[in-house]
Amino acid sequence: IYGAMNTLGLAKRIRAKILQASTSEVYGDPEVHPQPESYWGHVNPIGIRSCYDEGKRAAETLFMDYYRQNGVRIKIIRIFNTYGPRMNPNDGRVVSNFIMQALRNEDITIYGTGLQTRSFQYIDDLIEGMTRMMATGDDFIGPVNIGNPGEFTMLELAQKVIDLTNSRSSIVHMPLPGDDPQQRKPDISLAMEKLNGWQPQIQLEEGLKKTITYFENHL
């Protein structure tokens, strides 16, 4: 939140256009599927995951307030799960975790049943969406979902990684952390309309192959 306030203050002073990289986490554990930008979310503001989620929601509020009260030129995007080469192998995200475990032939850890779903977006598609968002006119500020609507369970993701790495890993299940969303999928209709027909070009298997190659070369 402090970072948002500082950069908004700077944008106000120098009359700069500013982009907020918000997140699909603002939707919480959604009861609407897929999630459009008009959905206000199903959130727990005091849960163990809520600090990040609520920080992003508060930042969106600050961006809108600076836009309404000070005329700051803002853009807001809501980024869904993104992966690709140059990820930190130890960043704790599910794609990097699964790939590293598979390359080392370690057990792949899935929390809960593994039937919870996510939508995975390749980094190049995200960058293209961000670039197009910044090129839109001042009459469109967002928020707009930037994500891949392809939806996969954690079990499906784990099996794809095992197959693509020819790994001997087994899948093990651990207790599900509290407040873990059961499903996540973007409605990208608005992005397609406002961002010059933007939609993801790299599907999961192709993106995983590129990411696995990078990790293999940097182990």
Predicted regions and their residues:
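Short, hinge-like loop/turn segments at secondary-structure boundaries
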Residues: 36-38, 93-94, 189-190
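Short-chain dehydrogenase/reductase
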Residues: 44, 48-57, 88, 92-93, ...
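Residue-level signature of the cytosolic catalytic core of signaling kinases
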Residues: 31, 47, 87-91, 150, ...
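N-terminal Rossmann-like NAD(P)+-binding domain of SDR-like oxidoreductases, especially those catalyzing
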Residues: 1-82, 102, 112, 124-127, ...
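C-terminal substrate-binding subdomain of Rossmann-fold SDR/epimerase-dehydratase oxidoreductases
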Residues: 81, 100-219
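Gly/Ser/Thr-rich beta-alpha loop segments that engage phosphate groups in nucleotides
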Residues: 5, 30, 86-88, 94, ...
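A generic local structural motif
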Residues: 4-7, 61, 95-96, 158, ...
